[in-house]
Amino acid sequence: MATSPMLFLVSLLLVLVAAATGDEASPSNAAAPAAPVLVGGRTEIRDVGSNKAVQSLGRFAVAEHNRRLRHGGSGGPADPVPVKLAFARVVEAQKQVVSGVAYYLKVAASARDPRGGAAAGGDRVFDAVVVVKAWLKSKELVSFTPASSTK
């Protein structure tokens, strides 16, 4: 009978799936995370001030924004900030695994005066999205917009 081995394999698969999901749902599982993690969801990056990789991505986002301005990219929907900026720091960051890793950064930067230095007026906060594909050794600025005043 050809159906007997197939029935056995399906039954075995169901038992394995039930065992795998039943263990995670058990309240006695001591290794369970404190907060639920959504697969494919965003996760906070802690200690962004001392995280050199995150600060480097913020610096890249501002440099890429300025490069696009030099090449006529101002005012477009993907880059609506019409002034060159001087990077200050990343103040907040999240990451999300997509086709690569998407970093959602809150970047503090100030407007640059025409001589290249930071202009008076202090830092403003911008939302930047950078996608890193390590296996291709690439990173791309997807968007760079003024941050909304509400969190």
UniProtKB/Swiss-Prot annotation:
MF-aspect GO terms: cysteine-type endopeptidase inhibitor activity
- Tell me which Gene3D superfamilies the record gives: 3.10.450.10
Its biological function? Specific inhibitor of cysteine proteinases. Probably involved in the regulation of endogenous processes and in defense against pests and pathogens.
Predominant cellular place of this UniProt entry's protein: secreted
Write down the InterPro entries for this protein, in alphabetical order: Cystatin_dom, Cystatin_sf
Extract the PANTHER family matched here.
CYSTEINE PROTEINASE INHIBITOR 10, CYSTEINE PROTEINASE INHIBITOR 2
- Site (Reactive site) location in chain: 40
Extract one GO cellular component term from the record: extracellular region
The family assignment reads: Belongs to the cystatin family. Phytocystatin subfamily.
SUPFAM superfamilies (UniProt xref): Cystatin/monellin
A Pfam family found in this protein is SQAPI
* Segments forming domain Cystatin: 40-109
The name this protein goes by in its record: Cysteine proteinase inhibitor 10
> What does the UniProt entry say about where the protein is found?
Secreted
Residue ranges annotated as motif Secondary area of contact: 96-100
Q: Which GO terms describe its biological process?
A: defense response
Alphabetically sorted, this entry's keywords are: Plant defense, Protease inhibitor, Secreted, Signal, Thiol protease inhibitor
Q: Where is the signal peptide?
A: 1-22
